[in-house]
């Protein structure tokens, strides 16, 4: 496995591989890898001749009062996990390398960015779109793998790739959970032992909404009301959003259906966690 920091070196390396006819699978991350990332890497290993992992804490997708400075980093540990998952190339650029002096290009996105995380994190998805477009240009992947925990991000990247005719197959992978149901996230490391227990309210809310829907409940107000009661009963929990949306368009739904997305963002103390489920999907 090779670790590359320089943008031009990475680009030349993959262009050489492409000339040899190699199929490149790509897993873009912000590092501090966990089993969720490992599932993406292992799947990527089966989908390409060469597996590339990027590790880059992208400053343009963090807001002014967000956790850019404190976001957890562990390049040595990340590289060890990557190697165990069969990664061939790790691309870990610097912010200066990705955004040199004079950088000014943006990617204008459409209505998929407006609700959910887009409403509470203005500018976030603009930053995601720019860095993903740049990474696709540098790595030249045939396919790229993203987790469904960031459901809105996945939808936006699919749409952007389609609209801009980027020759990359976008693969969404299931959420990976801890044994007690908490969705794996690098930000879980911020939680105290007590907060870690409180964070289980997100999964409890998902289970309750799924249970009620399976029992025939389709009222959006009743489903979200039950979920909200579960969250607000937890001392340090505060709701950012709890919503039912169409899983394709992310538009609001009048009544819940099998293809409805239940998505939530909750702060446990100062740590913002997200989770989701499509009601008709196998959990």
Curated annotation (Swiss-Prot):
It is found in: Cytoplasm. It catalyses: (R)-pantoate + beta-alanine + ATP = (R)-pantothenate + AMP + diphosphate + H(+). InterPro entries: Pantoate_ligase (IPR003721), Pantoate_ligase_C (IPR042176), Rossmann-like_a/b/a_fold (IPR014729). ATP binds at residues 30-37, 147-150, 176, 184-187. Keywords: ATP-binding, Cytoplasm, Ligase, Nucleotide-binding, Pantothenate biosynthesis. (R)-pantoate binds at residues 61, 153. The keyword Coiled coil does not apply. One of its GO terms (molecular function) is pantoate-beta-alanine ligase activity. One of its GO terms (cellular component) is cytosol. Its main location: cytoplasm. Disulfide bonds: none annotated. The active site is at 37 (proton donor). Pathway: Cofactor biosynthesis; (R)-pantothenate biosynthesis; (R)-pantothenate from (R)-pantoate and beta-alanine: step 1/1. Beta-alanine binds at residue 61. Homodimer. Belongs to the pantothenate synthetase family. Catalyzes the condensation of pantoate with beta-alanine in an ATP-dependent reaction via a pantoyl-adenylate intermediate. The reaction proceeds by a bi uni uni bi ping pong mechanism. This is Pantothenate synthetase. It comes from Trichlorobacter lovleyi (strain ATCC BAA-1151 / DSM 17278 / SZ). The lineage of its organism: Bacteria, Pseudomonadati, Thermodesulfobacteriota, Desulfuromonadia, Geobacterales. The gene is panC.
